[in-house]
Amino acid sequence: LIALREASQARNMTLMLDITPNHCSYNHPWVKDFETHIDGNTAEFFYYDEANDVFETWLGVPSLIKLNYQSQKLRDVMYRSVDSAIRKWLQPPYNIDAWRLDVANMTGNQASDQLDHEVWRELRHYARESNPDAYLLGEYFQDGTAHLQGDELDASMNYQGFNVPLRRWLTSEAKQVI
């Protein structure tokens, strides 16, 4: 990664990494720690239904465990601490320029917990402490405007906003050619 960073800088290219702050794999060390020590260090990182002995998951996918941003410890390891998942890579020797944030529209939200704006404002603040020019691109399946007001994310990838007009255009073009 360091060699890639050096090569990209030499070519005046931006280096963006991808992270999934919304959920983690069932095989992630945090999940394994929780399963071994139910009251351990990572217990509060997840939504866990004790009555049914199951994790809350992303869109019902059993292998994708939803992260619980009510946990201040989770926020520390994800973006607050200097060596957090977000900040570590924004600093030397990696010095990445940007993050693509997977499932940005659902991060921090689960049932009555609607923490997305709070999480993105905080994450932006801490990311910019490590790299004042850090660029944050959120993945959205619909309109991301609510998070693009200057204090959360810098831009969004909007699948429907791109795909729907493209499909309509292609379909229209195809009909005219035939």
Model-derived features: where do they sit?
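Active-site and adjacent substrate-binding regions of carbohydrate-active enzymes
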Residues: L1-I178
